[in-house]
């Protein structure tokens, strides 16, 4: 398949699309080469073997603890309609319905039910993900500190029936491969969906996170709240036109009734934050698996020196948590659905009125660029030595950013503590994009809100 490329046409449309014969949009390619994937080693775990035993371990995530209540009908669920049941299930799991994302490409387990007229809905919180396609089953992905992403499948609870929750093995075909960094993780597909089903092209394969160019995202998804920005692949059906890959527009709600869903949005901001979470989760899960495997090879002890490729991955992880490489938001910024913004901020941990969940939305996602994932039970449950290492590396990177800026102002030389941070050179690669004031604010927030952070909370 020939990828979209810059080409001319009779009439130029916004963001590089051109109108060809028959009204087909011929999509221009991204403005530059796709960003390279993280520098991960050619490593993948044997999930069945020691020390991982993915399917043999008992999960200790939040959803697994709720399964008995769900199975026995003790959760307060409204069974009057499919929509009402999904809404009440979201409330019971504390997942905001305003996080709804609609995907119409048949790139998931229940693909036979998914099409532009019956999109699958995805909902998410900081640690729990729920999927539902009308007429189908409920899918749940939850984050376990030892196992990574764990997947469950069950039929919609009916009046008087017992719910049977299945731990889904089939999900691992797509959730433990290149797209998830070879570990049990989360996947965000972006494809050019074909009019007869299937995909005509796939974008950003093997990549996840806030560094993926917007022009490679959202293929096969409905998107609302873009403010007119269309430099992405959302709201489009792929077409082949004279051997070239093009697209025709798809307006959300045109081929189906949004009344069938809890809300009428598939908000652009929710898509952006979901992308950040997926990239962070996959990197943290990979670090946990690699760390555990190295310790296992050393009889449970920490080695004197870690493999160089693992050190490189940990450095990249710390940079990711500090939003290194984040692509800029569209000109004019992003507004975000008010209901989603309110729901996103409801569990913010603030210090002096500032929080890691404070949104910027002018040129970047967050005002204080350190991932709020460090406040999740999933992060707290990582191997204690790994968590200690990540927090120490974060602190050194932030100290470097703060002191380097101070040194530039006063002529002072950054301290030894700062220059020994993760990354080489006079500025830490993980934090060189941060200004000194921002880095200092982030350190204050982390010290006050993250147990075990150097010099902070215990």
Regions found by a protein language model. Name each.
Residues 16, 21-38, 98-103, 115-157:
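Post-cleavage N-terminal segment of exported redox proteins
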Residues 111, 336-371, 375:
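Charged, low-complexity intrinsically disordered segments
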Residues 325-332, 336, 357:
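C-terminal catalytic/scaffold cores in eukaryotic proteins
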Residues 97-105, 329-334, 427-438, 457:
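Surface-exposed patches in mature extracellular/periplasmic domains of secreted proteins
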């Amino acid at each position: 398949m020939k990828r979209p490329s810059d080409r001319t046409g009779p009439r130029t449309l916004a963001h590089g699309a051109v109108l060809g014969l028959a009204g087909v949009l011929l999509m221009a390619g991204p403005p530059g080469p796709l960003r390279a994937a993280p520098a991960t080693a050619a490593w993948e775990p044997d999930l069945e073997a020691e020390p991982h035993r993915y399917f043999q371990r008992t999960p200790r995530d939040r959803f697994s603890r709720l399964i008995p209540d769900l199975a026995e009908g003790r959760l307060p669920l409204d069974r009057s309609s499919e929509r009402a049941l999904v809404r009440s299930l979201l409330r019971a799991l504390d997942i905001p319905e305003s996080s709804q994302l609609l995907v119409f490409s048949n790139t998931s387990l229940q693909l036979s039910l998914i099409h532009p007229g019956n999109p699958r809905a995805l909902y998410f919180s900081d640690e729990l993900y729920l999927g539902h396609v009308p007429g189908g089953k409920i899918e749940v992905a939850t984050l376990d500190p030892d196992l990574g992403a764990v997947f469950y499948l069950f039929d919609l609870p009916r009046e008087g029936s017992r719910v049977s929750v299945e731990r889904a093995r089939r999900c691992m075909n797509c959730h433990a491969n290149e797209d998830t960094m070879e570990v049990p993780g989360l996947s965000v597909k972006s494809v050019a969906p074909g009019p007869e089903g299937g995909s005509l092209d796939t974008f950003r394969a093997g990549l996840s996170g806030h560094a993926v160019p917007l022009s490679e995202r959202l293929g096969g998804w409905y998107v609302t709240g873009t403010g007119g920005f269309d430099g992405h692949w959302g709201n489009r059906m792929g077409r082949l036109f004279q051997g070239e890959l093009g697209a025709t527009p798809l307006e959300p709600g045109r081929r189906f009734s949004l009344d069938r869903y809890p809300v009428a949005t598939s908000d652009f901001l929710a898509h952006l934050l979901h992308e950040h979470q997926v990239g962070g989760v996959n990197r943290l899960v990979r670090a946990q698996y690699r760390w555990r495997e190295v310790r296992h090879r050393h009889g449970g002890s920490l080695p004197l020196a870690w493999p160089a490729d693992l050190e490189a991955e940990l450095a990249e992880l710390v940079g990711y948590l500090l939003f290194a490489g984040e692509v800029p938001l569209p000109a004019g910024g992003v507004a975000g659905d008010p209901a989603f913004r309110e729901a996103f901020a409801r569990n913010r941990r603030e210090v002096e009125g500032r929080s890691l969940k404070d949104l910027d939305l002018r040129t970047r996602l967050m005002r204080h660029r350190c991932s709020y994932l460090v406040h999740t039970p999933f992060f707290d449950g990582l191997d204690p030595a790994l968590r200690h290492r990540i927090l120490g590396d974060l602190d050194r990177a932030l100290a470097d950013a703060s002191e380097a800026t101070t040194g530039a102002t006063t002529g002072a030389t950054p301290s030894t503590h700062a220059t020994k941070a993760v990354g080489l050179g006079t500025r830490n690669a993980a934090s060189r994009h941060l200004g000194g004031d921002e880095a200092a604010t982030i350190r204050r927030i982390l010290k006050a809100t993250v147990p075990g952070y150097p010099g902070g909370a215990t």
